[in-house]
Amino acid sequence: MGVPDIGGTWSSRSGANVASMYTENGVRHQIALPEARLQGREAIAGAAQGLIDVVPDEVVEIRKVSEGSNGTVTVEWVFKGTHSGDAPGWPAKNEAVNLVGVSVCDMEGDLIKEERVYWDTATLLAGAGLLG
């Protein structure tokens, strides 16, 4: 079992590169959205590119990686950048984004078969001035 370079791949600012970390029919659950389920590289690439376009200078820093004996990898990360593109319900205000999250990944060899992504939406909205 290998650990994908989540930080470097997201920081490449390419949705297609992000999707290449997954198996062909890989699944990404974005639990905080609520339970947005993306299946397949095309869906994952589109969603990733949408986020990259909203925060075009984004960088993902990895804080900790833990490998389980059962083929599970847990990654604690920080998504940072400047919110300079509009998204539905999240108008651009050029504010700093500093979002801490955790990904729990079921691996198939060196690729992610299924990922469950958790982050604190309230922190994101407060930073955007949308939550008091």
Pin down the residues of each PLM region:
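C-terminal and inter-domain tail/linker signature
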Residues: M1-G132
